[in-house]
Amino acid sequence: MKNIIIILYLFIVFNCDKPDSLDVEIYKLDNGLTVMLNEDHNETSVFGAVVVDGGGKRDPSDATGIAHYLEHVLFKGTSKMGTIDYNTEKIYLDSIEVLYDKLASTEDDRRRLNIQKDINRVSVKAAEYAIPNEFDRLIEGMGGTGLNAGTGSDFIYYFNAFPSTQIEKWMEIYSHRFLDPVFRMFQAELEIVYEEKNRAMDNPFRVFYETFRKYFFKKHPYGQQTVLGSVDHLKNPSLSKMKEYYDKYYVANNMYLIIAGDFNKREVKRLIKEKFQKIKKGGTIEPVNILEKPFKGREVVDLVMTPYRMIRMGYRTVEPNHEDAVVLDVIQNMFNNSSRTGFLDRLTAENKILSAYATTGLGGTDLGGFGFQFVPKDDKQTFGEAEKLVLHEIDKVKTGNFDSELLDFIKLNINMSHETRMESVSGRLWLIMSIILDNKPWEDIKSYPEKINSVTKDQIIEVANKYFNDNYLIVRSDKGDHDKVKLEKPPFKPVAPKNTEAKSEYAS
């Protein structure tokens, strides 16, 4: 009876006609910028985002962290926004750029200190002309909420929500910020980035994860670089290299504009062309084509860096747009799911292991990976014993040791979660972003429930045996402290802009 109910539910919910609110129109402007529109009048607001195909993987190998740092700086305004007198301010900003480049090429500690003092002196002077947080105030002034940005390995995004009546103003402000950015308040933002990096380095679990990725991705920037950058590179930031990154990747043919919510497409298309056609077109951006070799059997790395013993295990799989990715999604939910009925969930519930979970998200656009993290139940349980327990659960999937009722329930769970995300504009916005990251058409998102429903037991067995083989990485951390490194802030005088209530030429 339970199976009949599940099948009937799936048929009714996922085979009915999809409303227009789930449609996404995708087209390109003449300059190559990709526009993605999702009109939904069930909402009273609009969500807007600009996405750049870049991220930490495209940081120069000698200047890691640049993409993330640039994301911070792009909130500081333009030659017309965020300044009371750009012509005078620019004299100091140009000097700061020269000094930072000089600092990056200087190794002598005494000379570095003198250069840092010069940077501080000129930065304090430049701050006399800056208007802090004017971009944020402009967005808030038009009723915008949720203003944020983020940098991942594969892309950078900027977004917020706003009233539908403010869509023209939003497009004007967002297009302007990318047309003519000025890299001001560099020292102040560097201090914020230092704080982020120090928090990350203080977190043993994050350090353990980044160390695992270093061994998992032995060549690709996914493992050999971090989004926040290395300590050495953050100590020697280069404004010139940041500008080079901006000039190369913040170009129309490498950017995406996403608008979802309560708007009229016909009216908005005219505004989009007017505002975003101005963004310059750049050269062809080549993909990061770095492949990883299979692991040679069971590769083991032993460390001491976490408050309690824990293990990460990883298998090479496929990129997100591969046909096996959907099957791997089902498999991941067979190990863990929100109803706590997965194979690894049961290990924890039966007190055989303290915690265990699986993830398909080890990689990104370029390369895939399926990971497991688990914690032995106590000090008596060895790493080997905990690993055997997890491998035994993996074998259940590989041998088909599960019934069809569990599989139907897993599919239902996945599809209900997907439908929940599709129902809201904010959830849909992130799904639209995901097709950029995963290099998929929107139709794949709409048809995802049908693809999940079509996954068979035989497919699960085949895919599990294809990827969960004898070649995998296992990184084990014994209980102990990791080596902590702290980024010390240079002996700078705080940069405190005076013009907190001023308005720029742009905002007036």
Model-derived features: positions:
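Sec-dependent signal peptide recognition
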Residues: 1-9
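Bacterial Sec-dependent signal peptides at the C-terminal "C-region" and cleavage site
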Residues: 8-21
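Mature N-terminal segment immediately following signal peptide/propeptide cleavage
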Residues: 18-52
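M16 family metallopeptidases and their MPP-like homologs
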Residues: 38, 43-56, 65-66, 83-176, ...
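Active-site recognition of the HExxH zinc-binding catalytic motif
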Residues: 64-72, 76
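An aromatic/glycine/proline-enriched structural segment found at the starts
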Residues: 177, 181, 201, 218-223, ...
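Non-catalytic, conformational "gating/processing" segments within enzyme and secreted inhibitor domains
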Residues: 187-191, 197, 205, 209, ...
